[in-house]
Swiss-Prot record:
SMART domains xref list: RHOD
KW Aminoacyl-tRNA synthetase (keyword) present: no
Protein name: tRNA uridine(34) hydroxylase
Gene Ontology biological process: tRNA modification
Group of enzyme by EC: oxidoreductase
UniProt gene name: trhO
């Protein structure tokens, strides 16, 4: 019986010919039977792929043969190719779509001018030394924080990474500009860019967590500053640390929009024409068509009409 694994990785490094790297990566993944999503730009590579563990090991070895990716870190998690609908390898202007390709600068050491990297234990030390002065700033989409975030974190009202620049320039967060700000995201890639954007806009003391929530959760489980589940962009939808949902230290943050029952599972609103918003709906409520909506009155009407059909 084969064992499946999922790889999460990124690397910021100058790439002269992104198309050539794209073709090589696509061929490599097809040869190894991997599925997932890989984005490549002149700034680097960003990928999540899944497949047989031996195939994943070979993928890591062969990908690191490219000089710019030699030191790239790969994060391993449970899962496999079945967690992805297909293989997608594409060239983009940005490997994370903040809408600022001209602002991002990279060299062989990574992003130029980004926030200071902190290991998980250094994050805890910073909080111990400076207490409530420290601000955790969520670098993900606001929806992701509904099921998990750092304790007392500031969660910007953004639906996509494209919204961050306008949000930072809105003045809402000027009170943070002279405070120690710890930016965080799933695996660290979004905060590589976000922390640089923040520094460019006058935030004076910006940090980022090395390896993101993934590494912090692996280190501390449910006994640190992280609360709840981590949203993931594959069929699993969410990931728990430590002993999972049964861990004595686990804090349930996500709740069904209809009945309030604890849940970490997102579903698309039934109103496919004008909504499709992802919302938390528990296993019981999702069984009934009339509660397969986001809660908006017009979406509730769509659900009700389909239930009667």
């Amino acid at each position: 019986m084969t064992i499946g694994k999922i790889l999460l990785y990124y690397c910021f490094t100058p790439i002269e010919d992104p198309t050539a790297i794209m073709l090589w990566q696509r061929s490599l993944c097809e040869k190894l039977g991997l599925k997932g999503r890989i984005l490549i730009s002149e700034h680097g590579i960003n990928g999540t792929v899944g497949g047989d563990m031996d195939a994943c090991k070979r993928y890591v070895r062969e990908t690191r043969e490219y000089p710019g990716f030699k030191k790239m870190e790969f994060k391993w998690s449970e899962g496999g190719a079945e967690d992805f609908p297909r293989l997608s390898v594409k060239v983009r202007d940005e490997i994370v779509a903040f809408g600022a390709p001209g602002e991002l600068k990279v060299d062989e050491n990574g992003v130029i001018g980004g926030g200071v990297h902190l290991k998980p234990e250094e994050v805890n030390k910073l909080v111990e030394e400076r207490g409530e002065e420290v601000v955790f700033f969520d670098g993900r989409n606001a929806m992701e924080a509904e099921i998990g975030k750092f304790k007392n974190a500031v969660v910007p009202d953004v639906r996509t990474t494209h919204d961050f620049i306008a949000e930072l320039e809105s003045g809402k967060y000027d009170w943070m500009k002279d405070k120690p700000v710890v930016s965080y995201c799933t695996g660290g890639i979004r905060c590589e860019i976000l922390s640089a954007l923040m520094k460019n806009r006058g935030f004076n003391e910006v940090y980022q967590i090395d390896g993101g929530i993934v590494r912090y959760g692996e280190k501390y489980g449910n006994d640190g500053l992280w609360e709840g589940s981590m949203y993931v962009f594959d069929k699993r939808m969410h990931h728990e640390f430590g002993q999972g949902l049964e861990d004595p230290g686990f804090i349930q943050l996500g709740h069904c929009v209809h009945c309030g029952k604890g849940t970490n599972t997102f579903h698309n609103c039934i109103n496919e024409d004008t909504c499709r918003k992802q919302v938390l709906i528990c296993d019981d409520c999702i069984q009934h068509v009339e509660t397969q909506h986001c809660g908006r009155p017009d979406c509730a009407e769509v659900a009700a009409s389909q239930a009667q059909a």
